[in-house]
């Protein structure tokens, strides 16, 4: 029933100046009208508020009635009839007595025992406000329970001390009825009884279900002590001459000062507080009686029997009204608290610390090293502190920052604890004394109830509080491989526990592998992507996937293009693939412009597109690419393998084949004048070290049939015009090798004759070669750098930039000399 009304806000307004006859006699409940004050909840016609709205269901009406009567019972402090509990559930009865967690109940007793209280006070004196350490010392209480108990401990301590102070001054006078202040302008000396009057702030009722995982002790030993001395129905007030007539106004507001609302079980004990201000009306729903000297603050008299873990600490220092000033009773008078310095006083002189001893102030300021932790010990604190002091002695009078001391404090803890020690030493004047960079900031606000411990203790407490409030970083750990990672990443992993022998063996293996890797790293420094990889041959175990045939026209253009440049040349292969016969025919070659960087040769995208269109116009498909190795073996480099593999995989998606051809015209290891040609594909097999895929070379067959002569002449003219003025152009009239009498042009003609030997008529072949030779001689005469001497082929010109002799020691594109 109570759960259905849990989220219902009930606003009941009444006139506190009028009262009606009680109608509690007609209700079937344990509450009787003679138990309570005259109710302000009834209207002039004597109707109860739950009877005003006919739309309220019977169950909700009963719930509202029960809640209001229970609240009236709380405020009146009258004994409850026994029969009232007969109609109630046991769970509801327990909710009145205590707040029980819906998840689980605490195994420890609800009320704090004397032993626990003594341990709490002992831990408070030893650790300060480190609730985790105090909870560990007590053992039977959680950190949350210790924190809640501490909140009420300090609050009740202030109340008790303030009450004892005022009790000696003001005697045992009783407060007159609050309602009488409306009719009587003066306060008389005669004692009158203060009947229970509902706090107007309670007119707005909100019932919530607490969800704290603990049982909370709602008995307060301080209140029990006060109840033995004075009647809870009365309160002591000082004798004064006159009190200004104050109109008591009631304003119903709902304010959420915490996630859990206060419930009151006794009459509020109004705390007397000396102040010079007057309560502000109509701003906060507080009923205030103001005199020139004394102010009654009902908000300070709320019951402390309910723990509120989510209430902000500022509620302990300020009244619930944001406009009321200094309404908390402090153990230090106002003048002292207002005269506090905004900053910690800079030290007057440099402090000398004994390197072999730890002061009590240090233990209080940096307690983490003195709590018995395995990672943080007093010896480690001494090491860090003394190292910082030594560094200060070395760099004095220059400012010693935190970063400069960290390199010498490896494996001494995280940077945050080192920074806290550095900050502490700086604040007490042990380091950075007299430096302008030293900052003495005001620490965070602290609980002023510790003021009586002495001014020095308070300063030490402030310092410790500031050090503990420094931002901490996320803790990082190393994974099993020694890499830094977040601690959460290692959650749920299983760790292998090894013996000492196994650890030693693995350590040796690790050292060996490390040495091996260092040795191989020096070898791999010369292992660049231009290293040549020999091609493997197909065998019976690994047969060729298809046959490769090359036309005469393709070989003629390929030789022409490769012979004219010392740099690598590049182009596309055109032809067709016959799947039924598993034959790839290379029928045409399209030279392309290259983008050479000196280390590699790449195909110009525009030229590549034009070459593809030219092949397509002749009815051929792109079935591969070619490039030259001018003066070294026609083996692919690692980069060539990677490029070929990418193209190969791309074309294979459509079922096409893609070959790679490498031609070497001036390889000095080749004893024959004919160019070396390699036609290859890349397999899926990896090398022993896994750095590349193994290339395989095909056996080339030459196709029968005459080439298109005019097309070959057109390609020749394009090649000569492009490369004759190039800085990498080959001087065609020079010997291509020291041990040969052949010039580069003669070598080219010999290669072309070899290609045409079995396919064309000898007369036609001779005519074709003669025209090619004449065209080369005529074209190169136009260039002053390439003058031809027909009579003396062995004579060399000193102004020639590139000759074939330079190939003996030069490897293009940065390739190693083989």
From Swiss-Prot:
GO terms for biological process: chromatin remodeling; double-strand break repair; positive regulation of transcription by RNA polymerase II; proteolysis. It comes from the Eukaryota. One of its GO terms (cellular component) is BRCA1-A complex. Signal peptide: none annotated. Residues 344-442 form the SWIRM domain. GO terms for molecular function: DNA binding; histone binding; histone H2A deubiquitinase activity; metal ion binding; metal-dependent deubiquitinase activity; metallopeptidase activity; polyubiquitin modification-dependent protein binding; transcription coactivator activity. Belongs to the peptidase M67A family. MYSM1 subfamily. This is Histone H2A deubiquitinase MYSM1. It is found in: Nucleus. Zn(2+) binds at residues 627, 629, 640. It comes from Xenopus laevis (African clawed frog). Binds double-stranded DNA via the SANT domain. The SWIRM domain does not bind double-stranded DNA. Gene3D superfamilies: Cytidine Deaminase, domain 2, Homeodomain-like, Winged helix-like DNA-binding domain superfamily/Winged helix DNA-binding domain. Metalloprotease that specifically deubiquitinates monoubiquitinated histone H2A, a specific tag for epigenetic transcriptional repression, thereby acting as a coactivator. Preferentially deubiquitinates monoubiquitinated H2A in hyperacetylated nucleosomes. Deubiquitination of histone H2A leads to facilitate the phosphorylation and dissociation of histone H1 from the nucleosome. Acts as a coactivator by participating in the initiation and elongation steps of androgen receptor (AR)-induced gene activation. Pfam families: JAB (PF01398), Myb_DNA-binding (PF00249), SWIRM (PF04433). InterPro entries: Homeodomain-like_sf, JAMM/MPN+_dom, JAMM_MPN+_peptidase_M67A, MPN, Myb_dom, SANT/Myb, SANT_dom, SWIRM. It is an enzyme of class 3 (hydrolase). Keywords: Activator, Chromatin regulator, DNA-binding, Hydrolase, Metal-binding, Metalloprotease, Nucleus, Protease, Transcription, Transcription regulation, Ubl conjugation pathway, Zinc. Its EC number is 3.4.19.-. A motif (LXXLL motif) lies at residues 745-749. Residues 548-680 form the MPN domain. A motif (JAMM motif) lies at residues 627-640.
